[in-house]
Amino acid sequence: MTTYLAGFTLGISLILAIGAQNAFVLKQGIKQHHVFLVCFLCALSDAILISLGVAGFGYLVTQFPLIETIARYAGAAFLTWYGISSLRSAFTQKHIMNPEGDASKSAWQTALICLAFTWLNPHVYLDTLVLLGSISTQYEPHKWQFAIGAVCASFAFFFSLGYGAKLLIPIFKHARSWQILEFIIGFVMLALAISLLV
């Protein structure tokens, strides 16, 4: 149980920071747009990466830095595109809360954007494959309990964030609130894109 809690605690601490993925989950939760799908894909992606890290695949990332380089540049390009889209939306679109959710993006489109936020983020490989993978070796022969704890942390966090966001819906019935959120998200995405390149 102690090993499980160590994995859970470290897992939560690594994903609590406000980043591109968390901002996207929050936005989808407020819009009530494919919330389960987004939360599930984020948590499942983490589960896959954590499992690979504990299984020893973090070694590949350290031995082949090209993996991290490709993820960094592709991630920066994606974040730049998304950031510019959010800023444009903040200044040009009319924002009205739709209680039935935003139907402008299909489940497939939403899933692809969600997966891009996860798999094109070079930090996710360092956090899951390398960091969690290497720390799990301290818990031999119970390293899979550590992994289960970290995976549970991801599921708990993303579903809490996605579904907890509905508490903010009253605030986002006003168009100005959406504009501010879009502006903040756009700024954060562009800042993260720059941070990947410098």
Q: What is the role of each PLM region?
A:
Residues T2, I194-V198:
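Juxtamembrane boundary at the C-terminal end of a transmembrane helix
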Residues T2-T69, L129-K143:
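Juxtamembrane transmembrane-helix termini in multi-pass membrane transport proteins
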Residues H33-A103, T110, G164-L167, F187:
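Membrane helix-loop-helix hairpins that form the core translocation module of multi-pass transporters
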Residues S51-L52, L131, F155-I171:
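Transmembrane alpha-helical segments of integral membrane proteins
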Residues A107-T128:
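Selected transmembrane alpha-helices and immediately adjacent juxtamembrane segments
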Residues Y139-A156:
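Short alpha-helical packing/oligomerization segments
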Residues Y163-F187:
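Interfacial loop-to-transmembrane junctions
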